[in-house]
Protein backbone atom coordinates (compact mmCIF):
# COMPACT_ATOMS: atom_id res chain seq x y z
CA UNK A 1 0.00 0.00 0.00
CA UNK A 2 1.26 3.47 -0.87
CA UNK A 3 2.18 5.87 1.92
CA UNK A 4 -0.39 8.32 0.49
CA UNK A 5 -3.21 5.80 0.95
CA UNK A 6 -1.96 4.90 4.43
CA UNK A 7 -2.03 8.58 5.39
CA UNK A 8 -5.48 9.02 3.83
CA UNK A 9 -6.92 6.10 5.85
CA UNK A 10 -5.22 7.28 9.06
CA UNK A 11 -6.58 10.82 8.73
CA UNK A 12 -10.08 9.59 7.86
CA UNK A 13 -10.24 7.29 10.90
CA UNK A 14 -9.10 10.11 13.21
CA UNK A 15 -12.05 12.23 12.04
CA UNK A 16 -14.65 9.49 12.63
CA UNK A 17 -16.83 9.35 15.74
CA UNK A 18 -19.74 7.02 16.12
CA UNK A 19 -22.19 6.38 18.95
CA UNK A 20 -25.53 4.88 19.91
CA UNK A 21 -28.05 6.40 22.32
CA UNK A 22 -29.52 4.13 25.00
CA UNK A 23 -32.49 5.07 27.15
CA UNK A 24 -35.78 4.01 28.68
CA UNK A 25 -38.87 4.80 26.57
CA UNK A 26 -39.96 8.46 26.81
CA UNK A 27 -36.64 9.76 28.14
CA UNK A 28 -36.40 11.99 25.04
CA UNK A 29 -34.08 9.95 22.83
CA UNK A 30 -35.63 10.84 19.49
CA UNK A 31 -35.75 14.51 20.51
CA UNK A 32 -32.06 14.52 21.48
CA UNK A 33 -31.22 12.74 18.22
CA UNK A 34 -32.97 15.42 16.20
CA UNK A 35 -31.33 18.27 18.12
CA UNK A 36 -27.88 16.80 17.50
CA UNK A 37 -28.75 16.70 13.80
CA UNK A 38 -29.99 20.27 14.05
CA UNK A 39 -26.68 21.49 15.48
CA UNK A 40 -24.78 19.32 13.02
CA UNK A 41 -26.55 21.09 10.16
CA UNK A 42 -28.05 17.83 8.88
CA UNK A 43 -31.55 19.24 9.31
CA UNK A 44 -32.68 22.84 9.64
CA UNK A 45 -35.78 22.35 11.73
CA UNK A 46 -36.42 19.57 14.22
CA UNK A 47 -39.78 17.78 14.14
CA UNK A 48 -40.66 16.52 17.62
CA UNK A 49 -42.20 13.06 17.69
CA UNK A 50 -45.29 14.16 19.56
CA UNK A 51 -45.60 17.33 17.53
CA UNK A 52 -48.84 18.64 16.10
CA UNK A 53 -49.90 17.42 12.69
CA UNK A 54 -48.67 20.54 10.95
CA UNK A 55 -45.12 20.02 12.20
CA UNK A 56 -42.63 17.65 10.59
CA UNK A 57 -42.43 14.08 11.76
CA UNK A 58 -39.23 13.00 13.45
CA UNK A 59 -36.42 12.39 10.99
CA UNK A 60 -35.21 9.24 12.72
CA UNK A 61 -38.70 7.70 13.04
CA UNK A 62 -39.31 6.95 9.37
CA UNK A 63 -41.40 3.78 9.34
CA UNK A 64 -45.14 4.39 8.93
CA UNK A 65 -46.05 2.72 12.22
CA UNK A 66 -43.43 4.78 14.06
CA UNK A 67 -44.95 7.99 12.74
CA UNK A 68 -48.42 6.88 13.82
CA UNK A 69 -47.40 5.86 17.34
CA UNK A 70 -44.62 8.34 18.06
CA UNK A 71 -42.10 5.70 19.13
CA UNK A 72 -38.91 4.30 17.60
CA UNK A 73 -39.32 0.63 16.71
CA UNK A 74 -36.39 0.08 14.36
CA UNK A 75 -32.81 1.26 14.50
CA UNK A 76 -31.65 3.74 11.90
CA UNK A 77 -28.34 5.35 10.99
CA UNK A 78 -27.94 9.11 10.78
CA UNK A 79 -24.69 10.51 9.40
CA UNK A 80 -23.61 14.13 9.49
CA UNK A 81 -20.54 16.35 9.71
CA UNK A 82 -19.74 18.80 12.49
CA UNK A 83 -16.55 20.85 12.78
CA UNK A 84 -14.58 18.59 10.47
CA UNK A 85 -15.73 15.39 12.18
CA UNK A 86 -17.72 12.68 10.40
CA UNK A 87 -20.36 11.49 12.87
CA UNK A 88 -22.33 8.26 12.63
CA UNK A 89 -25.28 8.37 15.03
CA UNK A 90 -26.80 4.91 15.47
CA UNK A 91 -30.36 5.61 16.55
CA UNK A 92 -31.92 2.67 18.40
CA UNK A 93 -35.47 1.58 19.25
CA UNK A 94 -36.70 3.13 22.48
CA UNK A 95 -39.38 0.55 23.15
CA UNK A 96 -38.35 -2.33 25.43
CA UNK A 97 -39.68 -4.98 23.03
CA UNK A 98 -36.88 -4.09 20.63
CA UNK A 99 -33.90 -4.52 22.93
CA UNK A 100 -32.47 -7.19 20.61
CA UNK A 101 -32.32 -4.71 17.71
CA UNK A 102 -30.60 -2.30 20.09
CA UNK A 103 -28.05 -4.96 21.01
CA UNK A 104 -27.19 -5.51 17.35
CA UNK A 105 -26.74 -1.77 16.89
CA UNK A 106 -24.46 -1.54 19.94
CA UNK A 107 -22.24 -4.15 18.26
CA UNK A 108 -21.48 -1.52 15.60
CA UNK A 109 -20.95 1.40 18.01
CA UNK A 110 -17.69 2.75 19.44
CA UNK A 111 -19.35 4.89 22.13
CA UNK A 112 -22.71 5.02 23.92
CA UNK A 113 -24.75 7.95 25.20
CA UNK A 114 -26.93 7.07 28.19
CA UNK A 115 -29.96 9.37 28.25
CA UNK A 116 -31.70 9.82 31.62
CA UNK A 117 -34.94 11.61 32.50
CA UNK A 118 -34.02 14.04 35.31
CA UNK A 119 -37.34 13.41 37.07
CA UNK A 120 -37.07 9.61 37.01
CA UNK A 121 -33.38 8.78 37.19
CA UNK A 122 -32.25 5.31 36.17
CA UNK A 123 -35.04 3.14 34.75
CA UNK A 124 -35.17 -0.62 33.96
CA UNK A 125 -34.49 -0.43 30.21
CA UNK A 126 -31.55 1.92 30.78
CA UNK A 127 -30.02 -0.47 33.32
CA UNK A 128 -30.41 -3.43 30.96
CA UNK A 129 -28.79 -1.61 28.03
CA UNK A 130 -26.04 -0.25 30.28
CA UNK A 131 -25.06 -3.83 31.10
CA UNK A 132 -24.82 -4.58 27.37
CA UNK A 133 -22.54 -1.55 26.93
CA UNK A 134 -20.43 -2.67 29.86
CA UNK A 135 -20.19 -6.17 28.39
CA UNK A 136 -18.87 -4.63 25.16
CA UNK A 137 -16.54 -2.25 27.02
CA UNK A 138 -18.02 0.87 25.43
CA UNK A 139 -17.21 4.36 26.78
CA UNK A 140 -20.46 5.77 28.19
CA UNK A 141 -21.48 9.45 28.12
CA UNK A 142 -24.47 10.53 30.22
CA UNK A 143 -26.98 13.21 29.22
CA UNK A 144 -29.50 14.03 31.96
CA UNK A 145 -32.51 15.42 30.14
CA UNK A 146 -35.66 17.50 30.80
CA UNK A 147 -34.10 20.00 33.24
CA UNK A 148 -36.79 22.49 32.21
CA UNK A 149 -39.34 20.31 34.06
CA UNK A 150 -39.58 19.32 37.74
CA UNK A 151 -36.58 17.10 38.53
CA UNK A 152 -34.80 15.19 41.24
CA UNK A 153 -31.75 16.83 42.83
CA UNK A 154 -28.79 16.73 40.39
CA UNK A 155 -26.37 15.51 43.09
CA UNK A 156 -28.81 12.72 43.93
CA UNK A 157 -28.83 11.64 40.27
CA UNK A 158 -25.02 11.46 40.18
CA UNK A 159 -25.04 9.38 43.35
CA UNK A 160 -27.61 6.99 41.87
CA UNK A 161 -25.42 6.36 38.80
CA UNK A 162 -22.39 5.67 40.99
CA UNK A 163 -24.20 3.43 43.49
CA UNK A 164 -26.42 1.43 41.13
CA UNK A 165 -24.15 1.09 38.11
CA UNK A 166 -20.78 1.11 39.85
CA UNK A 167 -19.69 3.84 37.46
CA UNK A 168 -17.76 6.91 38.56
CA UNK A 169 -19.20 10.24 37.41
CA UNK A 170 -17.73 13.58 36.38
CA UNK A 171 -20.11 16.50 35.79
CA UNK A 172 -18.82 18.33 32.71
CA UNK A 173 -21.53 20.94 33.07
CA UNK A 174 -23.95 21.79 35.88
CA UNK A 175 -27.57 22.98 35.79
CA UNK A 176 -28.56 26.43 37.02
CA UNK A 177 -31.95 25.86 38.60
CA UNK A 178 -34.47 23.28 37.45
CA UNK A 179 -38.07 23.23 36.24
CA UNK A 180 -39.50 26.66 35.46
CA UNK A 181 -36.43 28.24 37.12
CA UNK A 182 -33.98 26.49 34.80
CA UNK A 183 -31.73 29.21 33.39
CA UNK A 184 -28.98 27.28 31.66
CA UNK A 185 -25.80 25.40 32.52
CA UNK A 186 -22.33 26.14 33.87
CA UNK A 187 -19.61 24.72 31.63
CA UNK A 188 -16.83 23.45 33.90
CA UNK A 189 -14.49 22.97 30.93
CA UNK A 190 -14.37 26.66 30.07
CA UNK A 191 -15.63 28.08 33.38
CA UNK A 192 -18.54 29.91 31.79
CA UNK A 193 -22.29 30.21 32.33
CA UNK A 194 -24.37 29.46 29.24
CA UNK A 195 -27.78 31.10 29.19
CA UNK A 196 -30.30 30.08 26.57
CA UNK A 197 -33.44 31.52 25.07
CA UNK A 198 -36.23 29.26 23.95
CA UNK A 199 -37.00 29.79 20.31
CA UNK A 200 -39.70 28.23 18.11
CA UNK A 201 -40.23 25.55 20.76
CA UNK A 202 -36.69 24.36 20.27
CA UNK A 203 -37.13 23.61 16.58
CA UNK A 204 -34.20 25.86 15.67
CA UNK A 205 -30.76 26.33 17.18
CA UNK A 206 -30.95 28.09 20.54
CA UNK A 207 -29.40 31.52 20.95
CA UNK A 208 -26.93 31.26 23.80
CA UNK A 209 -25.00 33.73 25.86
CA UNK A 210 -21.77 32.71 27.61
CA UNK A 211 -20.70 34.69 30.70
CA UNK A 212 -17.71 34.07 32.97
CA UNK A 213 -18.57 33.20 36.57
CA UNK A 214 -17.31 36.46 38.09
CA UNK A 215 -18.76 38.76 35.39
CA UNK A 216 -21.03 41.54 36.82
CA UNK A 217 -23.47 40.90 33.93
CA UNK A 218 -24.58 37.73 35.71
CA UNK A 219 -26.80 39.76 38.04
CA UNK A 220 -28.95 40.82 35.09
CA UNK A 221 -29.62 37.21 34.15
CA UNK A 222 -29.61 35.21 37.40
CA UNK A 223 -31.51 35.66 40.63
CA UNK A 224 -29.15 36.04 43.57
CA UNK A 225 -30.47 32.84 45.16
CA UNK A 226 -29.73 30.78 42.04
CA UNK A 227 -26.28 32.33 41.71
CA UNK A 228 -25.31 31.45 45.29
CA UNK A 229 -26.80 27.97 44.91
CA UNK A 230 -24.68 27.43 41.81
CA UNK A 231 -21.48 28.52 43.59
CA UNK A 232 -22.26 26.26 46.53
CA UNK A 233 -22.90 23.23 44.33
CA UNK A 234 -19.74 23.86 42.31
CA UNK A 235 -17.77 23.89 45.57
CA UNK A 236 -19.33 20.53 46.51
CA UNK A 237 -18.30 19.09 43.13
CA UNK A 238 -14.79 20.43 43.67
CA UNK A 239 -14.63 18.81 47.12
CA UNK A 240 -15.76 15.50 45.66
CA UNK A 241 -12.54 15.77 43.67
CA UNK A 242 -11.35 13.91 40.66
CA UNK A 243 -10.86 14.89 37.07
CA UNK A 244 -12.12 13.35 33.89
CA UNK A 245 -9.50 10.73 33.06
CA UNK A 246 -9.88 9.83 29.37
CA UNK A 247 -8.31 6.41 29.85
CA UNK A 248 -10.89 5.62 32.55
CA UNK A 249 -13.64 6.90 30.22
CA UNK A 250 -12.44 4.78 27.31
CA UNK A 251 -12.20 1.75 29.62
CA UNK A 252 -15.80 2.25 30.75
CA UNK A 253 -14.94 3.15 34.36
CA UNK A 254 -16.13 6.78 34.48
CA UNK A 255 -18.91 8.64 32.69
CA UNK A 256 -18.86 12.36 31.85
CA UNK A 257 -22.27 13.79 32.79
CA UNK A 258 -24.07 16.58 30.92
CA UNK A 259 -27.29 18.32 31.95
CA UNK A 260 -29.75 19.94 29.60
CA UNK A 261 -33.11 19.97 27.89
CA UNK A 262 -33.19 18.46 24.42
CA UNK A 263 -36.68 19.79 23.73
CA UNK A 264 -35.56 23.40 24.25
CA UNK A 265 -31.94 22.84 23.10
CA UNK A 266 -30.37 23.67 26.48
CA UNK A 267 -26.94 22.04 26.70
CA UNK A 268 -27.12 20.10 23.42
CA UNK A 269 -24.31 21.93 21.61
CA UNK A 270 -22.08 21.86 24.70
CA UNK A 271 -22.58 18.11 24.88
CA UNK A 272 -21.83 17.59 21.17
CA UNK A 273 -18.59 19.57 21.29
CA UNK A 274 -17.34 17.84 24.44
CA UNK A 275 -18.32 14.45 23.06
CA UNK A 276 -16.21 14.99 19.93
CA UNK A 277 -13.25 15.94 22.11
CA UNK A 278 -13.56 13.01 24.52
CA UNK A 279 -15.05 10.16 22.46
CA UNK A 280 -13.18 7.12 21.28
CA UNK A 281 -12.29 7.08 17.60
CA UNK A 282 -12.67 3.73 15.76
CA UNK A 283 -10.42 1.09 17.29
CA UNK A 284 -9.24 -2.41 16.49
CA UNK A 285 -11.80 -5.26 16.58
CA UNK A 286 -11.54 -8.92 17.49
CA UNK A 287 -11.59 -11.27 14.53
CA UNK A 288 -10.61 -14.81 13.57
CA UNK A 289 -7.07 -13.53 12.93
CA UNK A 290 -6.82 -11.45 16.11
CA UNK A 291 -7.41 -7.74 16.69
CA UNK A 292 -7.47 -5.82 13.39
CA UNK A 293 -6.69 -2.09 13.44
CA UNK A 294 -8.99 0.27 11.46
CA UNK A 295 -5.95 1.61 9.58
CA UNK A 296 -5.21 -1.89 8.23
CA UNK A 297 -4.96 -1.40 4.43
CA UNK A 298 -7.41 -4.13 3.39
CA UNK A 299 -11.14 -3.40 3.56
CA UNK A 300 -13.37 -5.36 5.93
CA UNK A 301 -16.71 -4.86 7.66
CA UNK A 302 -19.68 -6.72 9.12
CA UNK A 303 -23.46 -6.65 8.69
CA UNK A 304 -25.25 -5.60 11.87
CA UNK A 305 -28.72 -4.91 10.49
CA UNK A 306 -30.95 -5.70 7.53
CA UNK A 307 -33.97 -3.61 6.58
CA UNK A 308 -36.63 -4.42 4.01
CA UNK A 309 -38.76 -1.83 2.23
CA UNK A 310 -36.91 1.32 3.31
CA UNK A 311 -38.12 2.66 -0.03
CA UNK A 312 -41.69 1.29 -0.46
CA UNK A 313 -41.70 2.31 -4.14
CA UNK A 314 -38.89 -0.10 -4.95
CA UNK A 315 -39.43 -2.86 -2.35
CA UNK A 316 -35.71 -2.86 -1.65
CA UNK A 317 -33.60 -4.61 0.98
CA UNK A 318 -30.63 -2.87 2.53
CA UNK A 319 -27.75 -4.34 4.56
CA UNK A 320 -26.26 -1.97 7.13
CA UNK A 321 -22.50 -2.56 7.19
CA UNK A 322 -20.08 -1.22 9.78
CA UNK A 323 -16.77 -0.54 8.02
CA UNK A 324 -13.98 -1.84 10.26
CA UNK A 325 -10.75 -1.52 8.30
CA UNK A 326 -9.19 -0.07 5.18
CA UNK A 327 -10.93 1.95 2.51
CA UNK A 328 -14.25 0.99 0.95
CA UNK A 329 -14.68 2.02 -2.70
CA UNK A 330 -17.73 1.87 -4.93
CA UNK A 331 -17.85 -1.14 -7.28
CA UNK A 332 -15.17 -3.01 -5.34
CA UNK A 333 -15.37 -6.81 -5.25
CA UNK A 334 -15.22 -8.42 -1.80
CA UNK A 335 -15.34 -11.91 -0.33
CA UNK A 336 -18.36 -13.04 1.69
CA UNK A 337 -16.88 -14.99 4.63
CA UNK A 338 -19.86 -17.23 5.41
CA UNK A 339 -20.43 -18.52 1.87
CA UNK A 340 -16.99 -18.02 0.32
CA UNK A 341 -18.58 -16.22 -2.62
CA UNK A 342 -17.34 -12.97 -4.16
CA UNK A 343 -19.74 -10.04 -4.24
CA UNK A 344 -19.52 -6.80 -6.24
CA UNK A 345 -20.66 -3.83 -4.15
CA UNK A 346 -22.06 -1.66 -6.91
CA UNK A 347 -24.59 0.60 -5.19
CA UNK A 348 -23.21 1.71 -1.83
CA UNK A 349 -25.22 4.37 -0.05
CA UNK A 350 -24.83 6.88 2.72
CA UNK A 351 -27.74 6.46 5.12
CA UNK A 352 -29.89 9.11 6.74
CA UNK A 353 -32.97 7.35 8.15
CA UNK A 354 -34.91 6.34 4.99
CA UNK A 355 -33.07 8.87 2.79
CA UNK A 356 -29.98 7.72 0.95
CA UNK A 357 -27.38 9.08 -1.40
CA UNK A 358 -24.68 7.28 -3.36
CA UNK A 359 -21.16 7.31 -1.97
CA UNK A 360 -17.80 6.66 -3.56
CA UNK A 361 -15.79 5.72 -0.47
CA UNK A 362 -15.94 5.01 3.26
CA UNK A 363 -13.48 4.30 6.08
CA UNK A 364 -13.29 2.57 9.47
CA UNK A 365 -16.14 3.75 11.71
CA UNK A 366 -18.51 4.58 8.85
CA UNK A 367 -21.80 2.80 8.28
CA UNK A 368 -22.85 2.17 4.69
CA UNK A 369 -25.96 0.71 3.11
CA UNK A 370 -25.59 -2.08 0.57
CA UNK A 371 -28.25 -3.49 -1.71
CA UNK A 372 -29.06 -6.96 -0.41
CA UNK A 373 -30.39 -9.43 -2.99
CA UNK A 374 -30.73 -12.11 -0.31
CA UNK A 375 -26.97 -12.63 0.13
CA UNK A 376 -26.32 -11.08 3.53
CA UNK A 377 -27.35 -12.20 7.02
CA UNK A 378 -26.91 -10.37 10.32
CA UNK A 379 -23.36 -10.94 11.58
CA UNK A 380 -21.83 -11.64 8.14
CA UNK A 381 -18.27 -10.45 7.47
CA UNK A 382 -17.15 -9.09 4.09
CA UNK A 383 -13.50 -8.46 3.29
CA UNK A 384 -10.89 -7.90 0.59
CA UNK A 385 -7.53 -9.63 0.79
CA UNK A 386 -6.71 -11.93 3.71
CA UNK A 387 -9.68 -13.95 4.97
CA UNK A 388 -11.09 -12.99 8.37
CA UNK A 389 -14.36 -13.14 10.28
CA UNK A 390 -15.59 -10.86 13.04
CA UNK A 391 -17.36 -12.19 16.11
CA UNK A 392 -20.98 -13.17 15.53
CA UNK A 393 -23.89 -11.28 17.09
CA UNK A 394 -25.89 -13.48 19.47
CA UNK A 395 -29.61 -14.09 19.20
CA UNK A 396 -31.55 -13.84 22.48
CA UNK A 397 -34.22 -16.01 24.02
CA UNK A 398 -37.77 -14.88 23.10
CA UNK A 399 -40.53 -14.88 25.70
CA UNK A 400 -43.82 -15.01 23.77
CA UNK A 401 -44.82 -17.24 20.87
CA UNK A 402 -47.66 -17.49 18.36
CA UNK A 403 -48.48 -19.14 15.05
CA UNK A 404 -48.83 -16.58 12.26
CA UNK A 405 -51.60 -17.70 9.92
CA UNK A 406 -52.44 -16.59 6.40
CA UNK A 407 -56.23 -16.90 5.95
CA UNK A 408 -56.03 -16.09 2.23
CA UNK A 409 -54.36 -18.85 0.11
CA UNK A 410 -54.10 -16.52 -2.90
CA UNK A 411 -51.59 -14.43 -0.90
CA UNK A 412 -49.25 -17.40 -0.30
CA UNK A 413 -46.27 -15.95 -2.21
CA UNK A 414 -46.58 -12.51 -0.59
CA UNK A 415 -46.92 -14.16 2.84
CA UNK A 416 -43.78 -16.26 2.34
CA UNK A 417 -41.79 -13.29 1.02
CA UNK A 418 -42.83 -11.09 3.95
CA UNK A 419 -41.93 -13.73 6.53
CA UNK A 420 -38.55 -14.34 4.90
CA UNK A 421 -37.60 -10.67 4.67
CA UNK A 422 -38.77 -9.72 8.16
CA UNK A 423 -36.91 -12.71 9.57
CA UNK A 424 -33.72 -11.80 7.68
CA UNK A 425 -33.71 -8.24 9.01
CA UNK A 426 -34.16 -9.48 12.59
CA UNK A 427 -37.55 -7.84 13.15
CA UNK A 428 -38.72 -11.12 14.67
CA UNK A 429 -37.42 -14.62 15.25
CA UNK A 430 -39.14 -17.32 13.21
CA UNK A 431 -39.43 -20.95 14.29
CA UNK A 432 -41.26 -23.95 12.85
CA UNK A 433 -43.00 -26.98 14.31
CA UNK A 434 -41.30 -30.34 13.86
CA UNK A 435 -44.74 -31.66 12.87
CA UNK A 436 -44.79 -31.60 9.05
CA UNK A 437 -48.55 -31.04 9.08
CA UNK A 438 -48.11 -27.70 10.86
CA UNK A 439 -46.60 -25.44 8.21
CA UNK A 440 -47.47 -22.08 9.78
CA UNK A 441 -44.45 -20.13 11.03
CA UNK A 442 -44.13 -19.54 14.77
CA UNK A 443 -43.34 -15.94 15.69
CA UNK A 444 -40.99 -15.69 18.67
CA UNK A 445 -40.62 -12.27 20.31
CA UNK A 446 -39.59 -10.48 23.49
CA UNK A 447 -42.80 -8.43 23.65
CA UNK A 448 -46.30 -8.10 22.25
CA UNK A 449 -45.45 -4.99 20.22
CA UNK A 450 -43.18 -7.07 17.98
CA UNK A 451 -46.20 -9.15 16.95
CA UNK A 452 -48.16 -5.99 16.18
CA UNK A 453 -45.30 -4.62 14.09
CA UNK A 454 -45.05 -7.83 12.06
CA UNK A 455 -48.79 -7.89 11.36
CA UNK A 456 -48.79 -4.18 10.49
CA UNK A 457 -45.85 -4.53 8.12
CA UNK A 458 -47.22 -7.71 6.52
CA UNK A 459 -50.34 -5.73 5.63
CA UNK A 460 -48.80 -2.36 4.70
CA UNK A 461 -45.69 -3.63 2.88
CA UNK A 462 -46.79 -7.02 1.52
CA UNK A 463 -50.58 -6.66 1.32
CA UNK A 464 -51.29 -9.70 3.51
CA UNK A 465 -53.86 -9.87 6.31
CA UNK A 466 -52.70 -12.27 9.05
CA UNK A 467 -54.07 -13.91 12.18
CA UNK A 468 -52.23 -14.84 15.37
CA UNK A 469 -52.74 -18.04 17.36
CA UNK A 470 -50.92 -17.63 20.72
CA UNK A 471 -48.91 -20.52 22.16
CA UNK A 472 -48.75 -21.12 25.95
CA UNK A 473 -44.96 -20.89 26.29
CA UNK A 474 -42.70 -18.24 27.83
CA UNK A 475 -39.19 -19.74 27.77
CA UNK A 476 -37.02 -20.90 24.83
CA UNK A 477 -33.73 -22.77 24.97
CA UNK A 478 -31.48 -23.89 22.11
CA UNK A 479 -30.25 -27.49 22.36
CA UNK A 480 -26.49 -27.13 21.94
CA UNK A 481 -26.14 -30.91 21.71
CA UNK A 482 -28.17 -30.79 18.49
CA UNK A 483 -30.70 -33.25 17.13
CA UNK A 484 -28.53 -36.23 18.10
CA UNK A 485 -28.62 -35.30 21.79
CA UNK A 486 -32.36 -34.65 21.55
CA UNK A 487 -33.05 -38.09 20.06
CA UNK A 488 -30.93 -39.83 22.72
CA UNK A 489 -32.76 -37.95 25.49
CA UNK A 490 -36.07 -39.56 24.56
CA UNK A 491 -39.41 -37.99 25.40
CA UNK A 492 -39.27 -34.60 27.12
CA UNK A 493 -42.38 -33.70 29.10
CA UNK A 494 -43.95 -30.25 29.48
CA UNK A 495 -42.20 -28.81 26.44
CA UNK A 496 -42.60 -28.29 22.70
CA UNK A 497 -39.79 -29.07 20.26
CA UNK A 498 -39.42 -26.61 17.38
CA UNK A 499 -36.66 -25.75 14.92
CA UNK A 500 -35.26 -22.31 14.25
CA UNK A 501 -34.63 -20.89 10.82
CA UNK A 502 -31.34 -22.82 10.54
CA UNK A 503 -33.02 -26.12 11.51
CA UNK A 504 -31.45 -26.19 14.96
CA UNK A 505 -33.55 -27.71 17.77
CA UNK A 506 -35.18 -25.37 20.27
CA UNK A 507 -37.27 -26.40 23.29
CA UNK A 508 -40.18 -24.22 24.42
CA UNK A 509 -41.31 -24.34 28.06
CA UNK A 510 -44.35 -22.90 29.81
CA UNK A 511 -42.30 -21.67 32.76
CA UNK A 512 -38.87 -21.69 34.42
CA UNK A 513 -39.89 -24.58 36.68
CA UNK A 514 -40.44 -26.89 33.69
CA UNK A 515 -37.12 -25.74 32.22
CA UNK A 516 -35.19 -26.42 35.44
CA UNK A 517 -36.75 -29.88 35.69
CA UNK A 518 -35.49 -30.81 32.21
CA UNK A 519 -32.05 -29.30 32.89
CA UNK A 520 -31.76 -31.46 36.00
CA UNK A 521 -33.06 -34.65 34.35
CA UNK A 522 -31.27 -34.31 31.00
CA UNK A 523 -28.06 -32.23 31.38
CA UNK A 524 -26.66 -33.79 28.18
CA UNK A 525 -28.96 -31.56 26.10
CA UNK A 526 -26.87 -28.46 26.87
CA UNK A 527 -29.68 -25.90 26.95
CA UNK A 528 -28.65 -22.33 26.04
CA UNK A 529 -30.59 -19.06 26.23
CA UNK A 530 -28.69 -17.54 23.29
CA UNK A 531 -27.82 -18.68 19.80
CA UNK A 532 -25.27 -17.02 17.51
CA UNK A 533 -26.48 -15.68 14.19
CA UNK A 534 -24.86 -14.65 10.92
CA UNK A 535 -21.17 -15.51 10.68
CA UNK A 536 -21.25 -17.03 14.13
CA UNK A 537 -23.75 -19.75 13.20
CA UNK A 538 -22.75 -23.28 14.15
CA UNK A 539 -24.28 -24.99 11.17
Curated annotation (Swiss-Prot):
GO terms for molecular function: GTP binding; GTPase activity; translation release factor activity, codon nonspecific; translation release factor activity, codon specific. It comes from Rippkaea orientalis (strain PCC 8801 / RF-1) (Cyanothece sp. (strain PCC 8801)). Belongs to the TRAFAC class translation factor GTPase superfamily. Classic translation factor GTPase family. PrfC subfamily. GO terms for biological process: regulation of translational termination. The keyword Disulfide bond does not apply. It is found in: Cytoplasm. One of its GO terms (cellular component) is cytosol. Increases the formation of ribosomal termination complexes and stimulates activities of RF-1 and RF-2. It binds guanine nucleotides and has strong preference for UGA stop codons. It may interact directly with the ribosome. The stimulation of RF-1 and RF-2 is significantly reduced by GTP and GDP, but not by GMP. InterPro entries: EF-G-like_DII, EFG_III/V, G_TR_CS, P-loop_NTPase, PrfC, RF3_C, RF3_dom_3_sf, RF3_GTP-bd. CDD domains: RF3, RF3_II. Residues 14-283 form the tr-type G domain. This is Peptide chain release factor 3. Keywords: Cytoplasm, GTP-binding, Nucleotide-binding, Protein biosynthesis. Its main location: cytoplasm. The keyword DNA-binding does not apply. Gene3D superfamilies: P-loop containing nucleotide triphosphate hydrolases (3.40.50.300), Peptide chain release factor 3, domain III (3.30.70.3280), Translation factors (2.40.30.10). It holds the Pfam family EF-G_D2. GTP binds at residues 23-30, 91-95, 145-148. SUPFAM superfamilies: EF-G C-terminal domain-like (SSF54980), P-loop containing nucleoside triphosphate hydrolases (SSF52540), Translation proteins (SSF50447). It comes from the Bacteria.
